[in-house]
């Protein structure tokens, strides 16, 4: 059997051995339970997250692989052990998303989030933008047998130095969100992990752009449609989260 399905508390992890892909769908406890950055004005203290039944109809989160393995060699990830075997085709990307939706058995949901964040660096795959647009057309067609009222695909990027088309990809992604995304547009997450450049270089093995270079690219991008771009950090006691450095490198308005 080429497809192995592992059930989780709120969804399934799908491993397609024949295609060499892994993807999943889960429910979501809601953004109100996420820890926010106080320097951005998010001061709510999270004491606990109430255990409750997650309803997939309210928010279905599908996470897919954009590549088979990954050309990045991050020291915190197992993907380098698999090697790199190329980009997922546009048909393959759409298949991951539609298969996950089909297995969820959701026909008409409130919100669909698609995260290009499982295996691979999505900005290396030019078909990611087109696949996200095609999914928008499928689920927002009133005559479709599967529909969602809101749609929010998200690209999570490590900002690779070697991607000569990085700026164009990010520009195309943000602009596509204005036309094909819901009120939040298309989401964009940057894997920063720490504000210490030496630690970042160790984590990403020197394959990610510097903080200044990332900040400069973000400043050149169109403004997000509504939801601001996200900076992701690996929060530990040793992680540098200096708010002054955040202000130095990154535009709070974006």
Regions found by a protein language model. Name each.
Residues 49, 87-91, 99, 103-104, ...:
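Ampiphathic alpha-helical segments that act as solvent-exposed interaction surfaces
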Residues 102-113, 118-254:
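Conserved AdoMet/S-adenosylmethionine-binding subsite of the radical SAM
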Residues 1-60, 64, 72:
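Flexible, acidic/Gly-rich N-terminal and inter-domain linker regions that tether
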Residues 22, 96, 121:
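Acidic-residue sensor for enzyme active/binding pockets
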Residues 8-12, 78, 116-119:
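Generic detector of contiguous secondary-structure segments
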Residues 29-31, 39-42, 69, 80-84, ...:
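Glycine-centered small-residue hotspots that permit tight backbone geometry or close packing
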């Amino acid at each position: 059997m080429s497809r192995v399905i592992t059930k989780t508390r709120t969804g399934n992890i799908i491993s397609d051995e024949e295609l060499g892909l892994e993807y999943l769908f889960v429910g979501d406890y809601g953004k109100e339970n996420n820890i926010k950055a106080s320097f951005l004005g998010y001061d709510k203290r999270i004491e606990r997250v109430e255990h409750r039944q997650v309803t997939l109809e309210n928010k279905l989160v599908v996470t897919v692989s954009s590549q088979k393995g990954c050309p990045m060699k991050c020291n915190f990830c197992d993907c380098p052990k698999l090697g790199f075997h190329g980009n997922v085709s546009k048909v393959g990307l759409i298949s991951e998303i539609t298969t996950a939706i089909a297995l969820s058995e959701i026909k008409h949901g409130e919100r669909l989030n698609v995260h290009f964040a499982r295996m691979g660096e999505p900005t290396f795959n030019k078909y990611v933008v087109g696949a996200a647009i095609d999914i928008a057309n499928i689920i927002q067609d009133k005559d479709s047998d599967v529909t969602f009222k809101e749609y929010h695909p998200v690209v999570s990027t490590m900002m690779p130095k070697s991607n000569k088309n990085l700026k164009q990809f990010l520009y195309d992604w943000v602009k596509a969100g204005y036309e094909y995304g819901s009120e939040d547009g298309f989401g964009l997450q940057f894997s920063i992990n720490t504000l210490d450049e030496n630690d970042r270089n160790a984590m990403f093995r020197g394959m990610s752009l510097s903080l200044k270079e990332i900040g400069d690219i973000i400043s050149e991008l169109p403004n997000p449609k509504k939801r601001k771009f996200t900076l992701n950090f690996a929060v530990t006691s040793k992680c540098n989260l200096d708010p002054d450095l955040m202000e130095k490198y990154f535009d709070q308005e974006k």
